[in-house]
């Protein structure tokens, strides 16, 4: 089932960030929400997920869906390792071989994933947060600036893993980078 925005508006004080926005995100579709900083892209994602209420309009089809997200601030548990962060978010059902494959796919070494995430670089943390969202049991995955701070090789590897892990789930990628849509094979909105 798709998620539909119908005439959604949102303001913060005097600043109108969304005005009469209507759009449909089909189940299994990859969409990049594009635009420069401050245009309301993250606010739109938060409204879709039910974390913010629109001032006007409605979101249809989101109720009952499971969401996973990697926002710009990673919100990882500092004292846990990369492995621990995935287990914490995804549950005990996440097995070692699947985790090892995921870490390798985005260029994290076995040594990297055993360290507390507080000791990892920004790019490494970004990849852990990305995996946490992708591996969670979710119908909709929201990735806010998912490749920010990654070098080109890491961007390519991470994007390939995102495409592989999408697997019928709706993907909303929030970005201002035009190349992200091409990397993900996503529709631009």
Which residues are covered by each model-predicted region?
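Helix-to-loop junction immediately C-terminal to a conserved catalytic motif
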Residues: 49
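Conserved ABC ATPase "signature" region
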Residues: 96-112
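ABC-family nucleotide-binding domains
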Residues: 144, 151
